[in-house]
Amino acid sequence: MNLSLISVLFLHLFFPLQAMAETFLPQDPGSVYDDLTGDYGVLGIASQFHVFAKEKTTINAHTEGNVATGVLSATNNFGTSISTGDLNKEINYAQSVKTIISSAETAASDKRSNKFIVGSNNVITTENDKIVVNGTKLDHLSVDEFYQDREDAQYIDFNKEFENLMLTSNMLMSLDPLKTYTPDDFPDMNNRVIDCTNLVGDQPYVINVTASVLAKNTPLRINNPQEKVLVINVVDAPTNFSVQSQIQYNKRSNHQTEDFSDANISWNFGNLTENLEINAPFQGTIIAPCTDITVNQSQDGTIIGKNVILNATTNRWDPNEFFTETNTHDDTTDTISSSTAPSTSESSTAPSTSESSTAPSTSESSTAPSTS
C-alpha cells in the first residue's frame, strides 16, 4: 500500500468528511391569506398563531405552539406536539432566523401537515434531504414542508396586521363593559372570583378589570359556565406592568391541547403599556400589539405583542372568533357578536369576508410601535 493511500485512509478515519450542503431554492409560500381562508374575527390571522410578534420572538423555554414573527431567536423547541386530529395544519413564519435548534417544530403525521416559511434574507441549503437554515439542520421538517419569501413579497405583512390590531385593541377598550372590577370588589383576597353566571345578553361579555386587580399575588378565578366569549379590558395599566395573579378559568389547568373549543377568554391590555410581564400562571389570549411581553410563568393562549420573550412553558390555545361593528359605548345597540362554534384553527375552508377590524377608536390614543 503506497504512502498516499495510507494518508487518505488516515484522514478519513480521524477526520471524517462532513456532509456537503447543497444549494436549494424553497417553494414560494404565497400569502398567508391563501392558507388561512376563514373569517377569524377582529383578531384576524393573529388568532391562528400561538405567538404573533411584530418584531422579535425569543424562545428560552419549551413552547407548545406555532410562531409568526419578524425575528426568531429560539434556543428551545417549539411546535404543537400533541396530535389528536383537531388541528390539521400548523404554520410557522419567521422573516429573519437569528437562532433555531434542530428539534424545532413537530414532525408531520397522517393527522397534521406543516408549513414553515422564512424570509428571503435567510441562507437555505439542504443536507441529507433535510433543510438547513443559516447553518442549522432542521430534523423535523421535510424539504416539501419548507418555503421562503421571494424578495418582492412577504408571507405576512406585519406592518399592516399590527395597524389593524392596534385599531382593534383601541376599539375593544371603547366598549361599554357589563361590569368593572377593582380591588374593592374582592374583600377576601384569598377568594377572588369573577362570576359570569348571571351576566345576560347575546353578545360576548365585555368586562373591565383595573390593572391593580392583576397586580395582587393571589389567584383570580373566572367562572364562565355558559362558555361565552369574554373580552377583559385591563384598564389603568402603567407603562411597565407585571401580572402577579394566577388566572384560573373554569377550573381548567394549563395544558397542551389542540382542542380550542373552550378558548373563550381574551385579555386586552391596549396600546399604552410598553412592557408587560406575566409572573403567574395565566390563561387566555393576550392582546398587546405595542408591548414588549415577557412570559415568566406558564401561559395558555395566543400572545400578540411587539416583542415576545418566553421564559416558561406556554401552550397554544387559539381563541374562538368574535366580531365587532363600528358602534362604540356611546351607542345602545349591540357592538359584538361571537361564534359559539369551536375555533376553526387553520382548518376552516370558509372564505374570509374581512381581514380584520379597521374601525378606529377614540378612547385610547394609538402610537405606532417601534421598528427598531
Each language-model region and where it sits:
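N-terminal signal peptide
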Residues: L11-Q27
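Hydrophobic membrane-targeting signal helices
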Residues: F10-P16, D39, G44
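A generic, well-ordered mixed alpha/beta core segment in the N-terminal half of proteins
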Residues: A104-K137
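Hydrophobic alpha-helical segments and helix pairs
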Residues: I131-P183
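Classical eukaryotic N-terminal signal peptides for Sec-dependent ER targeting/secretion
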Residues: M1-F10
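Low-complexity tandem-repeat tracts in intrinsically disordered regions
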Residues: T333-S372
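Long, polar low-complexity repeats
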Residues: E22-K115, L167-N327
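Intrinsic disorder/low-complexity detector
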Residues: S4, F14, G30, H329-I336
